[in-house]
Amino acid sequence: MTFKGFSKKDFKTMQIPGLEARMNGIQTDIQPKFRAVGEELTTYLSAKLGDEMFLHIARHQRRSVNPPESTWLAICHDKRGYKKHPHFQVGLFDNYLFIWLAFIYENEESAKIANRFLKEKKLLADLPDNFAISPDHTEEKTYPVHDGQLKATLERFRDVKKGEFLVGKIYLPDDSHLSPGKDFIKEAEMVLDELIPLYKASLQ
């Protein structure tokens, strides 16, 4: 498909009641956009990193009753799966779109990664002021990257078994960067460029 951007309808899809109905909306309206965006960004990251990257689209197969509050694509160096590894995400809650570098609870190197980020403070200090962090990919709550929550979030990621760390940028439904499609791709590439040094550091 030709990607024309994200619209307010995409966010409303994440408000559809019921598991089956919301999943139908996600599969029909959002996932084709994820595939189009993801293919472009996967190619971009592969070239930037000099390493083949692979696109994954969340399928929410473990859901049996409650509909997913968010949905996303992930880009990772592992073709078989992304959850154990540092990976990039583009996705939606019903009230914002996110572009993250994500370290979720399945990551087996959380202590090493957190300690590196805590020690090498410049890696995160250099991020733009309009970037954000999240301690939990299942929750909507985010914090500005430079508002004082960073150290506590990294320590929780290090010390708590289910701790997570996501860093990147969020966009409200009326943000002008979300469409047309070429503008969103350009914006996403700029965000990824800011996150690549963190990604590389996490793999060392």
Curated annotation (Swiss-Prot):
Signal peptide: none annotated. Gene3D superfamilies: Protein of unknown function DUF1054. It comes from the Bacteria. InterPro entries: UPF0637, UPF0637_domain_sf. Belongs to the UPF0637 family. This is UPF0637 protein Lm4b_01081.
